Amino acid sequence: MADAESQNGENHLPHKIYLDYNATTPPATEVVKAVEEALREAWGNPSSSYTAGCKAKELIDTARAHVAKMVGGKPEDIIFTSGGTEANNMVLFSTVENFNSTSKERQNNRVALALPHIITSNVEHDSVALPLLHLQKTHRAEITFVPVSTVTGRIEVEDIISAVRPNTCLVSIMLANNETGVIMPVGELSQCLASMSKERSAQGLPKILLHTDAAQALGKVEVDVQELGVNYLTIVGHKFYGPRIGALYVRGLGQHSSLLPMLYGGGQERNFRPGTENTPMIAGLGKAAELVFLHCAVYEAHMRRIRDYLEERLEAVFEDRIRLNSRFPGAERLPNTCNVSLLKPAMLGHEWLSHCQYLQASIGAACHSDRGDRPSPVLLNSGVPQEAATSAVRLSVGRETSQDDVDLIVRDLEQAAQLLGVNKKSLKKLP
């Protein structure tokens, strides 16, 4: 996607090309319109009975229905949050609190379990990994970080099942990785956990709930909570052309899946997330979800075609001087994600990007942008060699990225590599 930079006179320079859609996306035109209309017409308190308040409540109800439809759930199972970080934290801390609140009942059944045990992977987003490390450090939970396969880049179901203990109460596995694009076998995992539940229940052991952070998957591939079989699913608006708020899907909220509030206040969102609702942003999220529900297959096909073309051009130009880090045998991946390293000469990923004139991309997760010269732990944990991980660049295409955009940024990357000392004769010239 070319940005809106101005051009001077007849000097028609190429625009900047944004290829960091895994970090964030621009709000869709329809989303901006929905937000603006809500600001003008639905500024009232949704709990009030006057016109502007009733309009706000109507917009919130409509948005909730659209978000639920996008993930194949029910409107009553959707809780609006400030974003993915809050949604993830709600699940993790609720699980610990609920485990502790039911410990007396288990003791009466002569099943004494000291601390709750949570299983996750070693490639999770910081909004999952860091709260879990905090719970571990403060001796409030036992945490197991299961390594992903260094062959497939994905978590293996049997490794998760092998990590289950009597006190296991939650498994949290992302639906798709933000750096490699690898899609995790969450649906298969839920089936295995469900088959264990009857035996565990007979033994008086806690039910194992399943959470997935779907931030990277939504808007790129179809996401259906019925097929996934999850108890919790995290939704992040700004990853699919919506505003920077989020939502949490909770299967059978209050019945099949427990949730406790992190905040206490006015009772909004059925007391699970109090505070006067952010109507304009919720309306925007609902519109973004509606667009995904209607057009996801089209978005996916376009992004896959452009991503594949991008990788073809990179291989044609750089040949064996690059490594495509997001290609793992036997693993599915997001249709828009390409993680690539320039190996000859060895260089840091951010150095390569800094010499590009038109490309706007990143070396990985935005929350790790301050890691300096250190390679991505996610890539290392996924089996990417140290040299490649150090020089990695993440290119993620969007709904409007074109082949012309790809041609320009591949040429840009080639010229940047040349500036960094790559022998021009060793590279094929672009036509």
From Swiss-Prot:
Its cofactor is pyridoxal 5'-phosphate. Keywords: Cytoplasm, Lyase, Pyridoxal phosphate, Transferase. InterPro entries: Aminotrans_V_dom, Cysteine_dSase, PyrdxlP-dep_Trfase, PyrdxlP-dep_Trfase_major, PyrdxlP-dep_Trfase_small. Signal peptide: none annotated. GO terms for molecular function: selenocysteine lyase activity; transferase activity. The keyword Transmembrane does not apply. The keyword Transferase applies. The modification N6-(pyridoxal phosphate)lysine is found at K239. It is found in: Cytoplasm, Cytosol. Transmembrane segments: none annotated. It catalyses: L-selenocysteine + AH2 = hydrogenselenide + L-alanine + A + H(+). PANTHER family: CYSTEINE DESULFURYLASE FAMILY MEMBER, SELENOCYSTEINE LYASE. Belongs to the class-V pyridoxal-phosphate-dependent aminotransferase family. This is Selenocysteine lyase. It comes from Xenopus tropicalis.
